[in-house]
Amino acid sequence: MARRCEICDKGVVAGVSYSHSHRQSKRTWAPNIKKVKALVNGTPKTVHVCTRCLRSGKVQRAI
């Protein structure tokens, strides 16, 4: 599944996790992406959208 929102272009972010003893390990944070049917130019199309865009109403769901 895609790791990038097609609406806001939010994607994976890389960083470092620290343990209690301050040892580092590289890791990634991925956005919560859902595959939904949405209206794109008046036609229903399957798009990959983050949950923040779904909740804020930036996407009109196709029923």
Swiss-Prot record:
One of its GO terms (cellular component) is ribonucleoprotein complex. Keywords: Ribonucleoprotein, Ribosomal protein. The keyword Mitochondrion does not apply. InterPro entries: Bacterial_rp_bL28, Ribosomal_bL28, Ribosomal_bL28/bL31-like_sf, Ribosomal_bL28_bact-type, Ribosomal_bL28_sf. The keyword Ribosomal protein applies. Belongs to the bacterial ribosomal protein bL28 family. This is Large ribosomal subunit protein bL28. It comes from Clostridium beijerinckii (strain ATCC 51743 / NCIMB 8052). The gene is rpmB.
